[in-house]
From Swiss-Prot:
Residues 39-164, 191-319 form the EamA domain. InterPro entries: AA-Vitamin_Transporters, EamA_dom. It is a multi-pass membrane protein. Belongs to the EamA transporter family. SUPFAM superfamilies: Multidrug resistance efflux transporter EmrE. Coiled coil: none annotated. GO terms for cellular component: membrane; plasma membrane. This is Uncharacterized transporter sll1164. It is found in: Cell membrane. It comes from Synechocystis sp. (strain ATCC 27184 / PCC 6803 / Kazusa). Keywords: Cell membrane, Membrane, Repeat, Transmembrane, Transmembrane helix, Transport. The chain crosses the membrane at residues 15-35, 53-73, 91-111, 120-140, 147-167, 179-199, 218-238, 248-268, 276-296, 302-322. The lineage of its organism: Bacteria, Bacillati, Cyanobacteriota, Cyanophyceae, Synechococcales.
């Protein structure tokens, strides 16, 4: 058995980074449609009128699966001498980013899936890099070139087309903030994710990636649970031990969470700047395709046009990244923190 396990490890090490990245991208792209489909299936197993595979149950149990995986991978970073190096400011910012990125933002994304279709969630979620660039200019005072600005503007127009196309009075809709609840949740989640990205880049680069990742997952799961309890009561999680929930979550956790996260981390180990940016570019396209294949969601005219504009913006952004990156940066791995925070949309947790 030991020989077989050792041979399997050797085989995994021989697999090239692009293959791992491609596998992770496919899994992450399918995460939203698969989540929605599993929750739909849960309606056939209702317990006294309650769906045991609810969004909150899936998010909570999925996060527990992810947390277990992160602890196995990153436990060497949790050594006392490393923890003592963190200042009070580090712990405070870690706590803020954990609550925002691992409790509030995912909760909003899951709530959005209840209110609108997956295609809208994917397209409007592309606001995150737009918000990140704007906040970087305002808060970090970074300089941007014209191509980056054009890419951002086109992406923003693409989201606007998705939301406003076919609306009789778009101006009145904006003034009264009369957006769809699901669409609003996605936009707010994108803004929150952008804030955490800025905080991570500005203040948390010196913190070991293992401490950063495990602490975010642990605190985020804890805070999400108590937010849900405060809003809905303990009864909201009364079906969390349901066998049917765990049966599906073992599949979901094994494929979407474990295989997806392991493939992503393995791919990042030796991935180049270009490969990671390509992953970010391809993911939303595949997500829309999976929404059609798994949920039979046919994009509307607004989604087609908005998606084309978003794709154009993403391509221009990719070209800009290639032009501005130094040759040596394009051929070596990214900083581990920057790589892990690459925007590839919802990752299942």
């Amino acid at each position: 058995m030991k020989h077989v396990f050792s041979g399997f490890q050797t085989f995994l090490k021989q697999v090239h980074s692009p293959i791992y990245l491609a596998l992770a991208v496919v899994i992450f792209s399918a995460a939203n449609p698969v989540t929605s489909r599993i929750i739909e299936l849960g309606k056939t197993y209702e317990i006294n009128g309650r769906n045991p595979i609810s969004f909150c149950n899936v998010l909570f149990v999925g996060n527990l699966c992810a947390l277990g995986l992160m602890i196995l991978i990153f436990h060497p970073d949790w050594q006392l001498h490393k923890l003592r190096k963190l200042t009070r400011k580090d712990w405070f910012l870690l706590t803020v980013t954990a609550i925002l990125s691992r409790a509030i933002a995912p909760g909003l994304m899951f709530s959005a899936l209840e209110k609108t279709n997956v295609t809208n969630v994917v397209l409007i979620g592309r606001l995150e890099p737009v918000f990140t660039l704007i906040l970087s200019i305002l808060l970090l005072k970074i300089s941007v070139n014209w191509l980056s600005m054009v890419a951002t503007l086109i992406s923003f127009v693409g989201v606007a087309v998705t939301v406003f196309w076919g609306v009789a009075d778009p101006l009145d809709m904006v003034i009264n903030f009369d957006f769809g609840l699901g669409e609003s949740f996605v936009a707010i989640a994108a803004f929150i994710s952008a804030i955490t990205t800025i905080l991570s880049k500005q203040q948390l680069q010196s913190i070991p990636v293992g401490i950063f990742t495990v602490y975010r997952s642990l605190l985020g799961t804890f805070v999400f649970f108590w937010i849900a309890v405060i809003i809905y009561g303990f009864d909201h999680f009364m079906d969390v031990s349901s066998p049917i929930l765990w049966r599906w979550m073992l599949i979901y956790g094994a494929i979407i969470v474990v295989v997806g996260q392991v493939a992503w981390l393995a791919g990042l180990k030796n991935a180049s700047f270009i490969q990671i940016n390509l992953a970010s570019l391809v993911t939303p396209i595949l997500a829309i395709i999976f929404a059609y294949l798994i949920l039979l969601e046919t994009p509307t005219n607004a989604q087609y046009l908005g998606g084309i504009l978003l794709l154009l913006g993403a391509i221009l952004s990719f070209i800009d990244n290639l032009k501005t990156a130094k040759d040596k940066q394009a051929s070596k791995p990214l900083n581990s923190r920057e790589a892990m925070d690459t925007n590839v949309g919802f990752r299942g947790v």
